[in-house]
Amino acid sequence: MHPKNFHQQENQMANLILSSLPMFVCGFWVVMIALNQYFDGRNKARMMLMLFMAVATLLYAGHCVFLNRFYSNMPLFDSLYAFSNLAAYPMFYLYIDSMTSSESHLRRTWWYLAPAVVIGIIVSTIYTIMSPHDIDTFVRIISYKEDYGSGTGLCRVMGFVRFAAKIIFAIEVVTVLVAGSRKITAYNKSIEAYYADTEGKRLVVYQWFMYVFTACAVASIIFNFLGRYRFGDSPWTIAIPSLTFSSLLYILGFISLRQTFTIENFVQEEAEDASISEHLPDCESKNSLAQRIEEVVTQQQLFLRHNVKVSDIAAELFTNRLYVSTAINDEIGVSFSDYINKKRIDYAIQLMRTNPQMTMYEIAARSGFSSDKSFYRNFKRFTGKSPKKIDE
């Protein structure tokens, strides 16, 4: 074999592997989440994640076919790409929404997929009524050069649809990132206002994912307007976006399977606690309530209870959890979680100084923390030091 031909085959193989990697990562998580749903029972958030990964699989299958110039498969996979390219970010938002919003709100957000469905139908319809010559011209020449204005007839119409899809994509990305970040922030604040132990409940990692996806989204918009064809000439141009998105999607799937607490659990616990709450008398001010909260929490050392909730404090005061949470926020100036954990850290420091023989595990447990990780994280947060350096 001629060295030049061998080098070309090597490049083609590398292109195929790299361009298909994100597709296989997403397909892997579709299978894993489906098995999890079957054996562990249905979970709304994971179902939405599975649908997101399925859409992403179609998206990267379209990329793979395009970048490897599989011309005969282009009409089918380009139609799927037209849909999935505009459905991926809305589906990710639906996944975030399923973890942070009620079922009734989630039903309304399905309309966010409307642009993807409309564009997908239009593109597939145009391919269906195109002549073989027009399809060949569009697939082999116009779509790779992205010179949509040079086409005629249906090729020109397809070009306008493609350009409109790019505009819609950019709008979707910005909308999803802003709305998704707000959803996560609002949800985390609700968790902090209700629970002292927020480990495994807050969506901290997902907030970071939104920041990372912001950077990727900017790259996506740039790639979208530059044209996919620019990344198919060399394995090196495919490698960076392929490995980046493959890694992010794999990490997202891994973390998501470990996230067991969602809005469904929160709403259920709220409903159970609401049944034993009583209303605060109108004559008691927030300042007066804040003083009573401080007294009962300090005197009875309620902060030492594992998994203590704002409803537990409300029950001790014979009042409503909403009033307790509001009084802590407005009068004490912190969230319920920070209020309790600050007291736990102060108590832990006393234990460390009066009982130097105690292990950190014992100190964490006796201070009310449900895990070592939570203890170390809060200790560092409130003191700026690790437990071993507190006296330095």
Write out the residue ranges for each language-model feature:
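Alpha-helical transmembrane segments of multi-pass integral membrane proteins
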Residues: 39-59, 113-114, 159-225, 238-244
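N-terminal low-complexity or simple alpha-helical regulatory segments
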Residues: 2-141, 167
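The DNA-contacting recognition helix of HTH DNA-binding domains
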Residues: 321, 371-373
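Membrane-proximal linker segments that couple transmembrane helices to downstream signaling/catalytic modules
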Residues: 254-366, 378-381, 385-392
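Short, Lys/Arg-enriched, Gly/Pro-containing loop segments at transmembrane-helix junctions
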Residues: 136-137, 189-193, 262-270
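Alpha-helical transmembrane segments of polytopic integral membrane proteins
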Residues: 27, 31, 58, 89-93, ...
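Extracellular-loop-to-transmembrane junctions of the mid-late helices
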Residues: 11-21, 129-140, 146-179, 235-238
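C-terminal transmembrane-bundle signature of multipass membrane proteins
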Residues: 213-281, 292-295
